[in-house]
Amino acid sequence: MRYLTAGESHGPQLTTIIEGVPAGLYITEEDINFELARRQKGHGRGRRMQIETDRAKITSGVRHARTLGSPIALVVENKDWTHWTKIMGAAPITEEEESEMKRQISRPRPGHADLNGAIKYNHRDMRNVLERSSARETTVRVAAGAVAKKILAELGIKVAGHVLQIGSVKAEKTDYTSIEDLKRVTEESPVRCYDEEAGRQMMAAIDEAKANGDSIGGIVEVIVEGMPVGVGSYVHYDRKLDSKLAAAVLSINAFKGVEFGIGFEAAGKNGSEVHDEIVWDEEKGYTRATNRLGGLEGGMTTGMPIVVRGVMKPIPTLYKPLKSVDIETKEPFTASIERSDSCAVPAASVVAEAAVAWEIANAVVEQFGLDQIDRIKENVENMKKLSREF
């Protein structure tokens, strides 16, 4: 499976075309809109979320709530477009109109794509860069992830994302009993954190950063349960599932690091403290006594829960902007200010969940069948049976 997205932050709409979804999958616009609404929540979001109420429209690839096997097209309208029709319109304008155009940007923001993208594409108005590099694009990535989650749900595979850290505040309580328990608590949390006390401290940290004109980052975790053994490959580097998951997480705006299981803690431990002992269970077959490697060994799933974390840097748009240089005058100035969040970590956990779900669904569909969801279900069950009886 694959998908492409198109659209600018303040353009008329965002679009994604999803190819390779098996036929027969039940999905509705409401399934997708549920995930889009989750992305828009979270303490620390900016005024844009008060304007937009994202709703996806399926324009092809689905008939009577069942996928056809042909490409699925989804569009999400930008309600703020009415204020940007002149500035972001596709119609030609005169040089005089261009010179008088408001909101042209010549002062790049440190930490953003502005300057590098402007040099790459020779844009004198860096709005041409920031409109596409904006995290607004993650709206349709979450829409694609919603389709992937429907595939996984058919196969008994569950996915959940949550927040472990915002700023210096870390969640201490993570003793959830199941993915359902984790979701039940985090869906009610303004910062998507299982630890309620840590969640209150996280909100205070976000408020403090906002009051100071600053931004704040954090760490999110995604857990996948119900995976069959052997998804992925050890044969080639580009078929290892952990490499694909790492790329997916790092492709999210502002994410700068990724780890699995105990992750970077492994550097300070002996091998006996890192690797998971193999045990036999009459019901489950081969399993592990621990899950320090996060459900992945040799680029393949072990059947244990996949545990992947990503670190998100603070958003680079600051209301107390850093120093920069005007590309027209070459004089020092403070960077441009765009409407932005002070913290997007809670929303980013939903985006990370979607990104991980997509890669998992893609790997499962590729390995167990491409065309029909019922055939894939049968093949997955056969693989689980083989694993138990091996």
UniProtKB/Swiss-Prot annotation:
InterPro entries reported for this sequence: Chorismate_synth, Chorismate_synth_AroC_sf, Chorismate_synthase_CS
UniProt: NADP(+) binding residues: R39, R45
Gene Ontology cellular component list: cytosol
Keyword Amino-acid biosynthesis: yes
A Pfam family the protein falls into: Chorismate_synt
NCBIfam families membership: aroC, PRK05382.1
Enzyme class: lyase
Role according to the record: This reaction introduces a second double bond into the aromatic ring system.
Entry binding sites for FMN: R132, S133, S134, N253, A254, G298, K313, P314, I315, P316, T317, R339
Family indicated by similarity: Belongs to the chorismate synthase family.
Pathway: Metabolic intermediate biosynthesis; chorismate biosynthesis; chorismate from D-erythrose 4-phosphate and phosphoenolpyruvate: step 7/7
Organismal lineage: Bacteria, Bacillati, Bacillota, Bacilli, Bacillales
Keywords: Amino-acid biosynthesis, Aromatic amino acid biosynthesis, FAD, Flavoprotein, FMN, Lyase, NADP
Catalyses which reaction(s): 5-O-(1-carboxyvinyl)-3-phosphoshikimate = chorismate + phosphate
CDD domains tied to this protein: Chorismate_synthase
Gene assigned in the entry: aroC
Entry's Gene Ontology molecular function annotations: chorismate synthase activity; FMN binding
Cofactor(s) this protein requires: FMNH2
Protein name (database record): Chorismate synthase
A Gene Ontology BP annotation from the UniProt entry: aromatic amino acid family biosynthetic process
Cofactor note: Reduced FMN (FMNH(2)).
Enzyme Commission code(s) on record: 4.2.3.5
Subunit composition and interactions: Homotetramer.
